Amino acid sequence: METAALVTIFLSCLLVSFTGYALYTAFGEPSKELRDPFEEHED
């Protein structure tokens, strides 16, 4: 394969992996440990 194609595939996989990890952190099991600043400062 050409170098440009390999770089494109690598960057695409990296982007998909980062997006998947961000969604898992936001909505998956680790989200229970996240703090909510709006709930901490209710008036």
UniProtKB/Swiss-Prot annotation:
<keyword id="KW-0934">Plastid</keyword>
<dbReference type="Pfam" id="PF02468">
    <property type="entry name" value="PsbN"/>
</dbReference>
<keyword id="KW-0812">Transmembrane</keyword>
<keyword id="KW-0472">Membrane</keyword>
<feature type="transmembrane region" description="Helical">
    <location>
        <begin position="5"/>
        <end position="27"/>
    </location>
</feature>
<dbReference type="GO" id="GO:0009535">
    <property type="term" value="C:chloroplast thylakoid membrane"/>
</dbReference>
<dbReference type="InterPro" id="IPR003398">
    <property type="entry name" value="PSII_PsbN"/>
</dbReference>
<protein>
    <recommendedName>
        <fullName>Protein PsbN</fullName>
    </recommendedName>
</protein>
<keyword id="KW-1133">Transmembrane helix</keyword>
<keyword id="KW-0150">Chloroplast</keyword>
<dbReference type="GO" id="GO:0015979">
    <property type="term" value="P:photosynthesis"/>
</dbReference>
<keyword id="KW-0793">Thylakoid</keyword>
<comment type="similarity">
    <text>Belongs to the PsbN family.</text>
</comment>
<comment type="function">
    <text>May play a role in photosystem I and II biogenesis.</text>
</comment>
